[in-house]
From Swiss-Prot:
GO biological processes: apoptotic process; associative learning; axon extension; axonogenesis; behavioral response to cocaine; calcium ion import; cell division; cell migration
Modified positions (Phosphothreonine) in chain numbering: 17
Official protein name in the record: Cyclin-dependent kinase 5
Subcellular locations according to the entry: Cytoplasm; Nucleus; Cell membrane; Perikaryon
Keyword entries, A-Z: Acetylation, Apoptosis, ATP-binding, Biological rhythms, Cell cycle, Cell division, Cell membrane, Cell projection, Cytoplasm, Kinase, Membrane, Neurodegeneration, Neurogenesis, Nucleotide-binding, Nucleus, Phosphoprotein, Serine/threonine-protein kinase, Synapse, Transferase
Species per Swiss-Prot/TrEMBL record: Rattus norvegicus
SMART domains: S_TKc
Subunit structure: Heterodimer composed of a catalytic subunit CDK5 and a regulatory subunit CDK5R1 (p25) and macromolecular complex composed of at least CDK5, CDK5R1 (p35) and CDK5RAP1 or CDK5RAP2 or CDK5RAP3. Only the heterodimer shows kinase activity. Under neurotoxic stress and neuronal injury conditions, p35 is cleaved by calpain to generate p25 that hyperactivates CDK5, that becomes functionally disabled and often toxic. Found in a trimolecular complex with CABLES1 and ABL1. Interacts with CABLES1 and CABLES2. Interacts with AATK and GSTP1. Binds to HDAC1 when in complex with p25.
Residue numbers bearing the Phosphoserine modification: 72, 159
Main subcellular location of this protein, as a coarse class: cytoplasm
Chain's role: Proline-directed serine/threonine-protein kinase essential for neuronal cell cycle arrest and differentiation and may be involved in apoptotic cell death in neuronal diseases by triggering abortive cell cycle re-entry. Interacts with D1 and D3-type G1 cyclins. Phosphorylates SRC, NOS3, VIM/vimentin, p35/CDK5R1, MEF2A, SIPA1L1, SH3GLB1, PXN, PAK1, MCAM/MUC18, SEPT5, SYN1, DNM1, AMPH, SYNJ1, CDK16, RAC1, RHOA, CDC42, TONEBP/NFAT5, MAPT/TAU, MAP1B, histone H1, p53/TP53, HDAC1, APEX1, PTK2/FAK1, huntingtin/HTT, ATM, MAP2, NEFH and NEFM.
Family statement: Belongs to the protein kinase superfamily. CMGC Ser/Thr protein kinase family. CDC2/CDKX subfamily.
Regulation: Inhibited by 2-(1-ethyl-2-hydroxyethylamino)-6-benzylamino-9-isopropylpurine (roscovitine), 1-isopropyl-4-aminobenzyl-6-ether-linked benzimidazoles, resveratrol, AT-7519 and olomoucine. Activated by CDK5R1 (p35) and CDK5R2 (p39) during the development of the nervous system; degradation of CDK5R1 (p35) and CDK5R2 (p39) by proteasome result in down regulation of kinase activity, during this process, CDK5 phosphorylates p35 and induces its ubiquitination and subsequent degradation.
Length: 292
């Protein structure tokens, strides 16, 4: 740990405390994530270490770089590239108004990062505005990629903050255990709507039941034909047959027609029907977009 000088505590993440620090040799600013390990645990599980070391190979401009893994008997510290703020803080600073071109650019970068990881069979599983980081050049980077697989998706942060369900798809809310890349695509859809509404969450549920009701009230309760596997999920229970909202115009008023179409393709209750990151990047919504 002598290699890094701690500057200040940034906050409590899902897995532990995060510090801003400086590399004593290069003077580079980094983020140190001290992963909390259970006291009764035998130190760091080897499976977690294997997963984490794989993440060092994820090199992409829209993924937060994992520079280093510092491991002692009871402590695991992950050294990440430093970014100035997360998307949640960014929303707070834009006062309820976000330019449609910025929305498009941020979604494009989110999908680029997702596409890269998905092509390497790495899922995020816990995407939300708090782990989308933005640096001072306006570049968006996905943080905490793959940590959910290494450490499990926690039910609550150890700081007692409940891990949000707002970005979880219906299949996961119904107890699906076999995840595919579609879990991240649903979350991307929720974040897209939140971008379009300058920070207003699409489905701010209070618990699993409320979360599913909010989803079905907007998208319609799926029928057996629309989603045959739904009734087989471990925690499935029937919901009232809500009709789908005829148009998303009132839901995302600032989003144009092609944007609404892309959103509808991301927010499919049946995971099999959800668009992939690669397909989303080819969507007409981006036809007039020139990446910087």
């Amino acid at each position: 740990m002598q290699k890094y000088e701690k500057l200040e505590k940034i906050g409590e993440g899902t897995y532990g405390t995060v510090f801003k620090a400086k590399n004593r040799e290069t003077h580079e600013i980094v983020a140190l994530k001290r992963v909390r390990l259970d006291d009764d645990d035998e130190g760091v599980p080897s499976s977690a270490l294997r997963e984490i070391c794989l993440l060092k190979e994820l090199k992409h401009k829209n993924i937060v770089r994992l520079h280093d893994v510092l491991h002692s008997d009871k402590k695991l510290t992950l050294v990440f590239e430093f970014c100035d703020q997360d998307l949640k803080k960014y929303f707070d600073s834009c006062n309820g108004d976000l330019d449609p071109e910025i929305v498009k650019s941020l979604l494009f970068q989110l999908l680029k990062g997702l596409g890269f990881c998905h092509s390497r069979n790495v899922l995020h599983r816990d995407l939300k505005p708090q782990n989308l980081l933005i640096n001072r050049n306006g570049e968006l980077k996905l943080a905490d990629f793959g940590l959910a697989r290494a450490f499990g998706i926690p039910v609550r942060c150890y700081s007692a903050e409940v891990v949000t369900l707002w970005y979880r798809p219906p299949d996961v809310l119904f107890g699906a255990k076999l995840y595919s890349t579609s879990i991240d695509m649903w979350s991307a859809g929720c974040i897209f709507a939140e971008l379009a509404n300058a920070g207003r969450p699409l489905f701010p549920g209070n618990d699993v039941d409320d979360q599913l009701k909010r989803i079905f009230r907007l998208l319609g309760t799926p029928t057996e034909e629309q989603w045959p596997a739904m009734t087989k999920l471990p925690d499935y229970k029937p919901y009232p047959m809500y009709p789908a909202t005829t148009s998303l115009v009132n839901v995302v008023p600032k989003l144009n027609a092609t944007g609404r179409d892309l959103l509808q393709n991301l927010l499919k209750c049946n995971p099999v029907q959800r668009i992939s990151a690669e397909e989303a990047l080819q969507h007409p919504y981006f036809s007039d977009f020139c990446p910087p």
